């Protein structure tokens, strides 16, 4: 279910402030996976925490409006079962 338009997009205030003062090429570490990507974030790199490590996410124009957490998966896919003994 989408967020109500009257509420507007959500972004963590601290994250927005960090992004404003960050230099180009600097990785901005964040735990706020729920924050919406704003147009001001284009060209910046965020280190999004996935529960184990910070995944670098370089923001492009296509990502605006999505959440930061969408680009840092939390689960590792081990693949489907291998049939090692089967011929």
Swiss-Prot record:
It comes from the Bacteria. It holds the Pfam family Ribosomal_S19. GO terms for biological process: ribosomal small subunit assembly; translation. Keywords: Ribonucleoprotein, Ribosomal protein, RNA-binding, rRNA-binding. One of its GO terms (molecular function) is rRNA binding. Disulfide bonds: none annotated. GO terms for cellular component: cytoplasm; small ribosomal subunit. The keyword Ribonucleoprotein applies. Belongs to the universal ribosomal protein uS19 family. Protein S19 forms a complex with S13 that binds strongly to the 16S ribosomal RNA. HAMAP family: Ribosomal_uS19. This is Small ribosomal subunit protein uS19.
């Amino acid at each position: 279910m989408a967020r109500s338009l009257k509420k507007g997009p959500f972004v963590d205030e601290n994250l927005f402030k960090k992004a404003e003062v960050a230099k180009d090429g600097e990785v901005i570490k964040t735990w706020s996976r729920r924050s919406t990507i704003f147009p001001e974030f284009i060209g910046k790199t965020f280190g999004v925490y996935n529960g184990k490590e910070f995944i670098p996410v370089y923001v492009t124009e296509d990502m605006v409006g999505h959440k930061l957490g969408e680009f840092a998966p939390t689960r590792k896919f081990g693949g489907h079962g291998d049939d090692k003994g089967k011929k």
